[in-house]
């Protein structure tokens, strides 16, 4: 199992120990992996690096997603979703909400959190045609997909901050609130057993299937921004606290700190030797 982390130290890979992967981006903030394909972004300087190429991004990119051999970006400044081809040329752009800040892919659809317009927007791929928009309570800010069921975090109130965790069925549009939680929207992901892990405020919470009460509540986080679950492992990036952690999704739920420092996007990846020939791995510790 390999982990990628975008950090102030550059692009880092962890598989028992850290190695630094040199790239032209000195301070990457976002990344996306799909098999052996890794896309890396510096959203501050609007740069994208993928497959040996550097290209320019729109301002305000919040999210990178890989779809087949193509790339999706979501910008909270242009309020647009953009699909790029395999050579990082923009193919099509569609308006998507007001200050949109997250999206998820389900087969040939992409679901966008429209944030300030109060809707979840459903687009078809690859034409980015909007096929549905579901009004939801508050400002939807985070989304994870489990087949045709979406799990979302929506900010109901900023002062004091309150977040609604809910599920929505893509086929029927049925809406099911799960829990009202104190704190800002952080991140949400779905485990292999279809249960929910959510970062809200300073907490990490786990909700079993069909439960509105968390059976795990861990504190002492800053604000978790990225969560990824794979093979009973939970990867956590907490930029506010400046750390990346790995945890088993079974008791005793003890997060292990992998990295301390300024960090951004993280993900699990399976990268075969030789698939990134221009990324010469250094074994120096960050």
Residue ranges and their predicted role:
Residues 1-25, 29-33, 286:
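An edge-strand/N-cap motif at the start of beta-rich repeat modules
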Residues 5-9, 40-45, 73-77, 112-117, ...:
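Conserved beta-strand positions in repeat-built beta-propeller and related beta-rich domains
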Residues 10-13, 46-49, 79-83, 118-122, ...:
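Structural motif
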Residues 230, 237-286:
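Blade-level signature of beta-propeller repeat domains, shared across WD40, Kelch, NHL, RCC1
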Residues 17-23, 52-57, 88-95, 129-135, ...:
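A short beta-strand motif characteristic of beta-propeller blades
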Residues 16, 43, 51-52, 76, ...:
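Inter-blade boundary loops/turns of WD-repeat beta-propellers
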Residues 26-35, 59-68, 98-106, 138-146, ...:
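Repeated scaffold domains used in trafficking and secretory/extracellular systems
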Residues 2, 37, 70-71, 109-111, ...:
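Conserved core beta-strand positions within WD40 beta-propeller blades
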């Amino acid at each position: 199992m390999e982990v990628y982390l975008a950090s102030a130290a550059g692009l880092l890979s962890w598989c028992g120990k850290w190695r630094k992967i040199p790239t032209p981006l000195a301070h990457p903030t976002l990344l996306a992996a799909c098999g052996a394909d890794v896309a890396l972004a510096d959203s501050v300087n609007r740069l994208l690096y993928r497959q040996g190429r550097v290209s320019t991004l729109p301002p305000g990119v919040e999210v990178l997603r890989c779809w087949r051999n193509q790339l999706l970006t979501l910008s909270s400044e242009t309020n647009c979703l953009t699909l790029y081809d395999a050579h990082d040329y923009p193919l099509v752009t569609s308006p998507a909400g007001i200050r949109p800040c997250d999206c998820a892919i389900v087969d040939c659809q992409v679901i966008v959190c429209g944030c300030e317009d109060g809707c979840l927007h459903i687009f078809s791929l690859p034409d980015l045609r909007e096929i549905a928009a579901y009004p939801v309570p508050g400002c939807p800010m985070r989304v994870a997909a489990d087949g045709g069921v979406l799990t979302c975090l929506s900010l109901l109130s900023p002062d004091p901050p309150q977040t609604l965790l809910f599920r929505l069925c893509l086929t029927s549009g049925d809406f099911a609130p799960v829990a009202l939680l104190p704190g800002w929207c952080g991140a949400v992901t779905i485990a292999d057993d279809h249960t929910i892990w959510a970062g809200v405020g300073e907490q990490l919470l786990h909700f079993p299937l069909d439960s509105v009460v968390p059976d795990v509540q861990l504190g002492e986080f800053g604000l978790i921004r990225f969560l990824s679950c794979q093979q009973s492992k939970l990867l956590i990036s907490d930029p506010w606290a400046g750390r990346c952690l790995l945890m088993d999704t079974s008791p005793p739920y003890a997060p292990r700190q992998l990295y301390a420092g300024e960090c951004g996007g993280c993900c699990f990846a399976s990268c075969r030797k030789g698939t990134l020939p221009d990324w010469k791995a250094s074994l120096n510790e960050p």
